Amino acid sequence: MSEDNSHSREYVLEADSELRFEIEQKDAKVLVTLVTGFAELFGTELVKKKKYEFGVGAKVAIFTYQGCVLHVSGKMDVCYISKETPMVQYINCHAALEQFRMEAEERDKRGPVVLIVGPMDVGKSTLCRILLNYAVRVGRRPLYADLDVGQGAISISGNVATILIERPASVEEGFTKTAPLVYHFGHKSPGANNVLYNAVVSKMAEVTLQSLDANKRTKSSGIIVNTCGWVKGSGYAHLLHAARAYRARAVFVLDQERLYNDLLRDVPSNVHVVLLPKSGGVVERSKELRHESREQRVKEYFYGNTRTPFYPFSFEVKFQDLRLYKIGAPPLPDSCMPIGMKAEDNKKKVVPVTPTPSLLHHILTLSFAESTDDDVIGTNVAGFCCVTEVDMDRQSVMLLSPQPRPLPPNALLLWSEIQFMDNHA
C-alpha cells in the first residue's frame, strides 16, 4: 500500500513488521513518535513519547519485534507497512557474531572481523549500522571500517575511514564521528587507481587490527567492514584483497547469489560466507542522487546541519605557500622505469601539482605528513579544505576551511577529484 500522507495519523504495527517512508520534497519535515510498544530504527531503540524529526532525503524503516503504535505527521512521498523484512535474519547474524566475541573474550583473542559485501543499493551501510548498534547495545565496542570511497559513511568521499563505536547511533543523525582514522585516496571509484586503493586498504587494515589489541573490550568486539558496490572484475579482486588484509572471519553477502558462490570458492574455508536478503525498502539511487549525496556530505563537513551548524572560514593562500601534491603519476611501461621499479610503483608516486584554474571547486586533503619523504599514503588525514577561487593574476587561491588561517606549518595538501560547489548563503 502506498499513500500520500500529509496529515497526522497513527500506524499500528504487528510483531516483526516495519513502517517504511521516504521524503523527497525539499523543506518537507516528518515527525515520528513511538506511542506504545517497542520499535527501533536500524538497530537504535526509539524512546517512547519522544518526537523524532526527518527531512528531505530520508529513507526510513522503523521495525518492531513485539508490535507498536507510531504517530506520524508530515508530508511523505511514500509510506507503507511491510511484513516482509529481513530483520530476523540480521539479528541471527548478530547472534552468531556475538558467539564469536564471547569465544574471543574467553581466549583473549581478536573478535570477529566481518565484511559486508554486495552490489550497489542493497543496504550494505544499513546492515553495518544495524550490526554495530546491536553490538554496542550488549556492551561491545566494535570498530567500524568504511572502504566505500564513492559515498563515505564516516568521512567524505574519496577516503577510507575507521571509527570506534561506543554508543548506539542517533536515530536522526547516525553515529558520532569523533576522532576517525582517515586515509586519503582521492577518487570516488577504486578503479581510478587500483594499486593505490589496495595500498590504502592494506594500511588501514594493518593499523586497525593493531588498534584492536590496545583495549581488551574492543579487541573481543571485532570490526564491521563496509565495502564498495563494485563487485565484478577488479572490484571483486578488491573484495578478496580486503578479506585477506583484514583476516576476515565472516563475509555477509547481500542479495547476489553469484557473488556468494564466487566468494565460497575463493576465500579460505575457515571464512564463513553467508548469503542474506536485502530489505524490500532499499531504494535504487540514480547517478544524480549519488552525486547529491556526496555533495551533501561535503556540505555537512564544512557547514554542519540544522541541529549543529558550523561556521567555516575563507582565506587566501599564495601559490608559493601552497605545497600541493597528487598521489599517482601517469602510467609508464616497465621499460621506461628506473632500474628496480615497476610501472605499478608510479601509481603510488607522490607528484607535485601546479596550481591552475582547473583546481576550482576541488577538495584538498590536509595530511599529517610533513614531507614527501614521509609515508604519505600511510599517514592519516588532518582535515579537508575546498578551493573556492583561483586567481592567476594574484597567483593565489581562496580556501574554504573548518579552521581559520593560516594553514599549519609545513602543511602538505593532497589533490582529490571530489568537488564541491560552495553555494552556501
UniProtKB/Swiss-Prot annotation:
Family the UniProt entry places it in: Belongs to the Clp1 family. Clp1 subfamily.
Keywords: ATP-binding, mRNA processing, Nucleotide-binding, Nucleus
Binding site for ATP: E18, K59, D121, V122, G123, K124, S125, T126
Keyword Heme annotated: no
Any one GO MF annotation of this record: ATP binding
Domain of life the protein comes from: Eukaryota
Protein name: Protein CLP1 homolog
GO CC terms in record: mRNA cleavage factor complex; tRNA-intron endonuclease complex
GO process terms (BP): mRNA 3'-end processing; tRNA splicing, via endonucleolytic cleavage and ligation
Job description of the protein: Required for endonucleolytic cleavage during polyadenylation-dependent pre-mRNA 3'-end formation.
HAMAP family given in the database record: Clp1
Subcellular localization, as worded in the UniProt entry: Nucleus
SUPFAM superfamilies documented for this protein: P-loop containing nucleoside triphosphate hydrolases
Alphabetical list of Gene3D superfamilies matching this protein: Clp1, DNA binding domain, P-loop containing nucleotide triphosphate hydrolases, Pre-mRNA cleavage complex subunit Clp1, C-terminal domain
